[in-house]
Swiss-Prot record:
Record's subcellular location: Cytoplasm
SUPFAM superfamilies: Nucleotidylyl transferase (SSF52374)
Protein name: Pantothenate synthetase
Known EC number: 6.3.2.1
Recorded name of the encoding gene: panC
Active site: H37
Organism whose genome encodes this protein: Cronobacter sakazakii (strain ATCC BAA-894)
Reactions catalysed: (R)-pantoate + beta-alanine + ATP = (R)-pantothenate + AMP + diphosphate + H(+)
Length: 284
């Protein structure tokens, strides 16, 4: 496995792979890797001849400087995990390598609508930072396939739209959320939880499952479902941030024509902001 830190070396390796006719998969990450990321690598390996994993804590997608500063950097451990899993390349650039002119003068990619709704409304600039860095990685790596986790539901929708709108000839693969045995969605931010909070954390998915059961049973009073869920989370010790039930295909409000709903969960537990989601087939 080759660890690459500069754009020229990355381009050199990509040119070589292209000359050899290799199919390339990209797995974009911010590091602090867990089993969910390893599932992305597995999917990438099954879909291509060469797997490039990027590890870059992207400052452009953080709306708070303190959040950026405390985000875990575990490059050595990450590379050891990736080597064991069979990744071929790790691209681990510095911010200066990715944004040589600084971020204030950086051209950016913005996806209208999806960037500013839901999660984007409470995190200004976050999705613009995501779409910009992913677009840059697409240009540098020139992958045939790129793998993203379904845990970040809105992000995946945004990447799919950006890929289509910008004319990238890249297959976007969404990989199902990996969960701990108690149901908690794996996330790098779970490391912010204390041991006591970690015991409470699976309550997020339990409340989400209850919401899904109500939808499957035909209940359509969304305000009542969300209010009950918010109360249940508060009783467990969470601070509900944003609970939504939307059309799974458009992320707009549910309509009589909606065939699938998505439950989007965001709640604070101590210093950790936990997110989760679940899609539900709707009976007409």
């Amino acid at each position: 496995m080759l660890i690459i830190e500069t754009v020229p070396l990355l381009r050199q390796q990509i040119r070589r792979l292209r000359m050899e006719g290799k199919r390339i998969a990209l797995v974009p990450t911010m590091g602090n890797l867990h089993d969910g990321h390893m599932k992305l690598v597995d999917e990438a390996k099954a879909s291509a001849d060469a797997v490039v994993v990027s590890i870059f804590v992207n400052p452009m997608q953080f709306d708070r400087a303190d959040d950026l500063a405390r985000y875990p950097r575990t490059l050595q451990e990450d590379c050891e995990k990736l080597k064991k899993r069979g990744a071929d390349f790790v691209f681990a650039p510095t911010p200066e390598e990715v944004y040589p002119q600084g971020m204030s003068d950086q051209t950016y990619v913005d996806v209208p609508g999806l960037s500013t709704m839901l999660e984007g409304a409470s995190r200004p600039g976050h999705f613009r930072g995501v779409s910009t860095v992913v677009s840059k990685l697409f240009n540098l790596v020139q992958p045939d396939v790129a793998c993203f986790g379904e845990k970040d539901y809105q992000q995946l929708a945004l990447i799919r739209k950006m890929t289509a709108d910008m004319g990238y000839d890249i297959e976007i693969i969404g990989v199902p959320t990996v969960r701990a045995k108690d149901g908690l969605a794996l996330s790098s931010r779970n490391g912010y939880l204390t041991s006591d909070q970690r015991k409470i954390a699976p309550g997020l998915s339990k409340v989400m499952n209850t919401m899904a059961e109500k939808l499957r049973a035909g209940e359509r009073d969304l305000e009542a479902i969300i209010a009950a869920a918010s109360e249940a989370l508060s009783e467990k010790g969470f601070r509900p941030d944003d609970l939504q039930i939307r059309d799974a295909d458009t992320l707009q409000a549910l309509s009589p024509a909606s065939q699938r709903a998505v439950i989007l969960m965001a709640a604070w537990l101590g210093q950790a902001r936990l997110i989760d989601n679940q899609t539900v087939e709707l009976t007409q």
